[in-house]
Structure formats: C-alpha cells, structure tokens
Amino acid sequence: MLNFYKTIDGKVSQIHAVEDGCWVCAICPTEPEVRYLVDVLGLEQDFVRAALDEEESSRVESEEEQTLVIVDVPTAERQDEEKTVVYSTMPMAIITNNRFITTVCLRENAVISELSQGLVKNIQTHLRTQFLLNILLRIATRFLQYLKQIDKISYTTENLLHQTMRNKELIQILGLEKSLVYFSTSLKSTEVTLEKILRGRIIKLYDADEELLEDVIIEVKQA
C-alpha cells in the first residue's frame, strides 16, 4: 500500500500524488509498488527492499544523494480470544533525498498511524531531516510506552501465576521475556545508529536537528 502525505496549513494531510516536500508511506508494498518507488521515484532498490526483510538490522548509509536509516519499530498485537498482547519489533526504512522522504515497513504500526492521522504536533514533511528525527523520537517514545506496559502485565501475571500455577500465565511470562530480548537488542542497535547520525557525516544536522537528535538518544537510553 502506498500513500502520500504533506504538511498543509500546519497539518499532515493525505495527497493524491508525489510532490516536493511530501512523505511517501509504503506499507507492505506489492512488487508493482516497489517498482514504482524504484523506477519512477528513483529510490535505490536496495534501500526500498531493506525493510521488507524481517531480519534487517539497524544502520545508516548513503548512496547518490539518498540516505537510508533502518531502525526497528516496536509492535503490539493481540493474538487470541483472551486478548493476550504479543510485543515484537519490525524494521522500518526511512529514505531521504532532495525532494521528499519515504518510509517503508512490512505492517501498519502505531508510529505510522499517529503521523499519518495528524496526531503528532509540529510535523513539517518538507523539513526532511527534522521529520526523520521526529519519526525516530516517536519510535523511542513507543518503546518506552510498551516497556511500561510489559512491566505492568508482568507484575499482574506473576501474581496470578503464584496463585493459580496455570499454563496460561507461565506462557505469557515466557512471551514477555522474549519480547524484552527483542526490545533490548533493537534498542542497542538503534543507539549505535543514532550515534552515527549525531556525528553529522552522513546526514547534515542543523543546531535544532542536533537538539532533537539528542532528545531521541536520551529516550532510547531511558528505554
């Protein structure tokens, strides 16, 4: 699925086609959509396909005036009739060039939803570096939110486990521990990527960008 958004009159709004200063949002793109991103919009094929590999690791690289930032995004999904929440991560590619910014990921997620629905204030899609950093900040904030949820669920489930010793609670505890491993690994690799960006060699940072990036790093370290 491909959608296009642009900040109009201070609000992120959906538009019908690519424009300078817009945000191209690709969620589980079909092969024709991938070809459109590569052949028509001129994005690097390896950059576009990077986030379509579940095992892709966080990194930042640049190629012919395009910059790729790969980070893991935390996810939370209910998977059974008893509404057990399963926490995991998936890669997201953020690609910038001199015209627009593109995000690519395998599934819809809370970060993309918040941004596309205009729920995040002060988003300017034409300020590509600032927008990229705001995406990273929302990801870091979402990690913190989910970690707090995991902590709360773990506490409640452990108390139930002591009282009932049922398999359900034991399975949930094991699932939460697995989620924490995913999150820990993702946050460590994301922190390394952010430190590379902070050096300013791949992405040009202005003073305001540096301050925003430092806020992102603080959030990641807290998580």
Model-derived segments and spans:
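Peripheral, non-transmembrane regulatory/ligand-interaction domains of membrane transport proteins
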Residues: 1-222
